[in-house]
Design a protein with these regions (language model features):
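Feature marking well-ordered beta-strand scaffolds used for ligand recognition
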Residues: 1-144
């Protein structure tokens, strides 16, 4: 969320920030909620591709793919963050991953959609189906 210049002249971000704004007064929006996810190197496809964000106010959910890093630039989570969303709050609901080991190529979640009461997550290697109501994995299809 905060960006610094590194010693070589490039930039490094300090985590991923999500915010909710109170726009009751459109000319003076107020940050009502904020969360910083991960450390420098944390990445989400949604930073560069708006289609990677799944949002449904009627379902009360928001989801996006995420590769989270720690202080030493090591990845400690690769998958999707799922949030409960209402008019006045955002709360983490579930974290879904396709990874079965630390270094599995092609298991990074790149898209999330919902159909009915099910959430579908897609990576190059898998498609998983999760119940929105229970957060449980219902099905998995290996694409390899």
């Amino acid at each position: 969320y905060d960006t610094e210049e590194n010693q070589w002249g490039g930039t490094v971000t300090g985590g991923l920030k999500i915010s909710m704004f109170d726009v009751t007064n459109v000319s003076k929006p107020k940050e009502a909620f904020t969360e910083i996810i991960g450390k420098a190197g944390t990445y989400s496809e949604v930073l560069y591709n708006h289609k990677a964000l799944m949002f449904s106010l009627s379902k009360g959910i928001m989801a996006f793919p995420l590769n989270r890093t720690t202080d030493d630039y090591k990845s400690d989570f690769s998958g999707a963050y799922i949030y409960n969303v209402s008019n006045d709050s955002i709360d983490i609901r579930n974290m879904i991953t396709h990874r079965e080991s630390d270094k599995t190529y092609g298991d990074e979640i790149i898209r999330i959609i919902y159909i009915g009461d099910y959430l579908y997550t897609f990576s190059e290697n898998k498609m998983q189906v999760h119940s929105i109501d229970t957060n449980n994995k219902v099905s998995e299809l290996i694409i390899k």
